[in-house]
Amino acid sequence: MILELADIRIQPGQQAAFEEAIARGLSTVAVRAKGYQGAKVNHGIENPERYVLQIFWDTLEDHTVGFRESPLFTEWRAIVGPFFAAPPVVEHFELSFKSA
């Protein structure tokens, strides 16, 4: 399993609309992507315009090729992209340790 972390900064004052949009994008677009396992959206406390999106994929290629190079990515960005203050910083991780 691969964890995608996207550090997202949105336009000020758009939190409620962004949260609705990202929930809609995940539930209508991301769920149709091959290898998509689920997601979590985390809202910044100290910085209310910051979100950390966690998406779980079967493989790295399911995200970087299967999703990013498909029409689904265009749909996704049309829903969430208008809220971005800057392009998200995206990185991928593999699990090294899990507590009980």
Where are the language model's segments positioned?
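Glycine-rich beta-strand-turn "strand-cap" elements at beta-sheet edges
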Residues: 2, 40-49, 75-100
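Active-site-flanking beta-strand signature of metal-NTP-handling nucleotidyl enzymes
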Residues: 3-8
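Short hydrophobic/aromatic beta-strand micro-patches
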Residues: 9, 42, 54-56
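Short, surface-exposed ligand-recognition loops at beta-strand->loop->(often short) alpha-helix junctions
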Residues: 9-21
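Feature marks short, surface-exposed loop/turn motifs that line or immediately flank catalytic pockets
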Residues: 12-14, 45-47, 59-61
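An amphipathic, aromatic/His-enriched active-site/gating alpha helix that lines ligand/cofactor pockets
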Residues: 24, 28-36, 56-89
